[in-house]
Amino acid sequence: MMSHQQVQINLILMQGIWTSVLKMQNHSTLLQLGSSSTMPQRPRLLS
């Protein structure tokens, strides 16, 4: 039986790079989306 984990997604601007932060119960993952110079607008997260 699978247990449902709570996943929290945050979007931050880190050193000029849009970064998506996935926080789970035991760990967090950083996904670099692209630089703010090529993406001046805040990226939208579609759920």
Curated annotation (Swiss-Prot):
What domain of life? Viruses
Q: Which family does it belong to?
A: Belongs to the orthobunyavirus NS-S protein family.
Q: Which gene encodes it?
A: N
State the coiled-coil residue ranges: none
Origin species, per record, is Bunyavirus La Crosse (isolate Aedes triseriatus/United States/L74/1974)
Q: What is this protein called?
A: Non-structural protein NS-S
A Pfam family that this protein carries is: Bunya_NS-S
Q: What does this protein do?
A: Inhibits host transcriptional machinery, by producing modifications to the phosphorylation state of the C-terminal domain (CTD) of RNA polymerase II. Inhibits phosphorylation at serine 2 in the heptapeptide repeat (YSPTSPS) of the CTD of RNA polymerase II, suggesting that the elongation step of transcription and/or 3'-end processing is prevented. Inhibition of host transcription machinery leads to shut off of host cell protein synthesis and inhibition of the host innate immune response. NSs also seems to be involved in the nuclear relocalization of host PABP1.
Q: Does the keyword Transmembrane helix apply?
A: no
* BP GO terms, sorted: symbiont-mediated suppression of host gene expression; viral process
Assigned keywords, A-Z? Eukaryotic host gene expression shutoff by virus, Eukaryotic host transcription shutoff by virus, Host gene expression shutoff by virus, Host-virus interaction, Inhibition of eukaryotic host transcription initiation by virus
